[in-house]
Structure formats: C-alpha cells, structure tokens
From Swiss-Prot:
Protein name listed in UniProt: Nicotinate-nucleotide--dimethylbenzimidazole phosphoribosyltransferase
Pathway(s): Nucleoside biosynthesis; alpha-ribazole biosynthesis; alpha-ribazole from 5,6-dimethylbenzimidazole: step 1/2
Active site: E318 (proton acceptor)
Name of a matching Pfam family: DBI_PRT
Gene source species: Escherichia coli (strain SE11)
Keywords: Cobalamin biosynthesis, Glycosyltransferase, Transferase
Keyword Glycoprotein set for record: no
A GO term, aspect molecular function: nicotinate-nucleotide-dimethylbenzimidazole phosphoribosyltransferase activity
Domain of life: Bacteria
Keyword Transferase: yes
GO biological process: cobalamin biosynthetic process
Subunit structure: Homodimer.
Length: 359
C-alpha cells in the first residue's frame, strides 16, 4: 500500500488551460456574459478538474457518511444519549434519515461507514472500517494515536478511489456522532487561531446554560494536547475524532482522482481545514454546499476561502447539505453542455466580437 505522503503527492493541480477554454465557451452561450453568476464560475471550476477531462459532467453520485462515537461525550457537551449514534446509523441502512431522503431525491447513493461506533458488535448493513469503540476523551487524552489516524485516512482514501474507478464523479461528505461538534470546534480553533468561545456553538440543541462548559472543554483539550496547527494529521489525532478523519480521507481521495467533493456543514469544514493542512492542492476540489447555522461556520469558511451556495439555516449534519446541493452541480453541467451558442443565432452582444464567439 502507498504511504500517506505518496498519496498526497498524487493530487493533480487544477488545469488552468481547461478553465480558460470553459470560460470562452460559457461566454459564447445564449445569454449575456456573466448573467448566470456563480453557476458559470462553478462550471468553469469543474472544467478545470482533471478527473472530468475538461468537460463538466456528473456520473454516479455518492455521499459517504462517517459514523463514530466520541469519548468527550462524557464531559456533558451533548444532550443526546450516546446510543443515538448507533440507532441513527441503523436508521440510515433503512433509508429513513434526512441525508438518505435528500440523497435519494438527488439520485445519489449513501455509503454508511462505521469508523468508530461504540457497540459490542458491528451493525449489520454498515461498511466496517471501525478503528475503535469511540475516540479518546480529548479533555483528558488524545482522540487517537497518529498511527490510527494515518491508517484510517489511507483506508478511506483507498475506498474513495475505488468508488471513482467504478464511475462516481461527484462525492459528498457527511458524519454521524453524538458530541462531535466539540472536537470540530477544537479543530477550527486550533487551525484558525480563534478563541474557543468564538467557534463553539450549541450543536444538537445544547441548552445555553451548558455552553460555557463546552467552551471550557474545548479550551482544555487544546491546552492539554497541544496540537500543531500546521500538521493536519496531528490536529485530527489529538483533538479530532474518527468521523472527522474519515471525512478528510474522502476529500483527499476524491482530489487525488481529480474529482469534486461537496462539503456539508460545520463538521466538514473542520475536516477540510485539517485536510488542507495536509495538502493545500485539494482546496480547488472542495465545493461548499451550504452555510451551517453552527456558530463557528463563518470563521471556518473564511479561513478556507469558500462561500457556500445555499443558506437554509441547516445544522443537521449527516451529509444533508451536500445531498441538497448536488442538483446545483448538475445545473452547472447542464448549462455548459446543453445551452445554445450566440454565434449559431447570429447574436452579437456588446462586449463580444464575432471572433470571440467563434473562438
């Protein structure tokens, strides 16, 4: 098996020549230049991804949901029982959760992956990549060893690349795990340098009178574990969780194939921050689906330099926002491939010349 360093070195650069050709093509379509706004920019971004061979298109779609428990749940940072992780993972196998319904609407397959659920036996119907029965309590110890983090990254990268070989061209990331907004906030605080109180939110409806404890837990975790903000693996291993590592692996795996990844909400932003520390080359492959309602969302997205396409006041997680945004990707591909051209209709708009239209 390749090492993580070897895999990171395989991530291709975006093709600027393909993007320039796409820009000229889009400017010559039956519309005023720029009138389809961010949809045009999205099509151009897709055209630059080597895995799509210069033509924006969508083949198979997949949302990969990483499921794991967190030792930090013991610190009272979540109101949901820890057992809900396993219950909801099982519900995902029945197709009844939010992400499953939205993914079905978008024509995407949901891959439910156990990377660290705290049950005695594996849950039937889940893809088993379990590292342990939940991560360590980051308030008193590292979430996991560096070796565990690297192995899980490699496993997920390889799984993602295999899906790409089988025709998946659009990936979405999601997660499931009680208390996981706490390690996500710790990652965001560590990498952005912002104080815990600026990035810690209520997660799954944590009462406001418990928020101070959650902020304190994040601060203690960072102080105790001393994650290196320049080392994405170190941050994930010390103050992250198996679900966050898994999402980072999907991003790295898809980017290594030159393919796009739709982010979800706050948890995925945290994973993206860590993944980009491992390989800044993945950033052009990341597409932000929606603006999470979680407190630190804007801070994380600003650090990533990303602007979401939707603002639906969602904070469910699971990959729900990624699934919801998949039709936007398909719309960008549709305008690129199916609209008529100005030149064919003998239309010359101000700012366009005949040579422009025929180039």
């Amino acid at each position: 098996m390749q090492t993580l360093a070897d895999l990171l070195n395989t991530i291709p650069a975006i093709d600027p020549a393909a993007m320039s050709r796409a820009q000229r093509h889009i400017d010559g379509l039956l519309k005023p230049v720029g009138s389809l706004g961010r949809l045009e920019a999205l099509a151009i971004q897709l055209a630059g991804m080597p895995g799509l061979n210069g033509i924006p298109h969508v083949g198979k779609k997949a949302v990969l949901v990483m499921c794991a428990d967190h030792g930090v749940w013991e610190e009272g940072v979540a109101i949901s029982p820890k057992e809900v992780t396993a219950i909801q993972a099982e519900n995902m196998t029945r197709g009844t959760t939010g992400v499953c319904v939205l993914a079905a609407q978008a024509g995407a397959n949901v891959h439910v992956i156990d990377v660290g659920i705290d049950t005695a036996e594996p849950i039937p119907g889940l893809i088993n990549m379990r590292v342990a029965r939940g991560s360590g309590n980051i308030a008193s110890a590292p979430a996991m060893s560096r070796r565990q983090a690297v192995k899980l990254l490699l496993d997920v990268i390889c799984y993602t690349r295999e899906l790409a070989k089988n025709g998946v061209t659009l990936f979405g990331v999601g997660e499931l795990g009680m208390a996981n907004t706490t390690p996500a906030a710790a990652i965001v605080s560590t990498i952005t340098g912002r104080a815990p109180e600026e990035v810690v939110g209520i997660g799954a409806n944590l009462p406001t009178d418990k928020l101070a404890n959650k902020i304190d837990v994040v601060r203690r975790a960072i102080t105790l574990n001393q994650p290196n903000p320049q080392d994405g693996v170190d941050v994930l291993a010390k103050v992250g969780g198996f679900d966050l590592v898994g999402m980072a692996g999907v991003m790295l795996g898809a980017a290594s194939c030159g393919l796009p990844v739709l982010l979800d909400g706050f948890l995925s932003y945290a994973a993206a921050l860590a993944a980009c520390q491992m390989s800044p080359a993945i950033k052009p492959y990341l597409i932000p689906s929606h603006l999470s309602a979680e407190k630190g969302a804007r801070i994380a997205l600003s650090h990533l330099g990303l602007e979401p396409y939707l603002n639906m006041e969602m904070r469910l997680g699971e990959g729900s926002g990624a699934a919801l945004a998949m039709p936007i990707i398909e719309a960008a591909c549709a305008i690129y491939n199916n609209m008529g051209e100005l030149a064919a209709s003998n239309i010359v708009l101000p700012g366009n010349t005949t040579s422009d239209l025929n180039s």
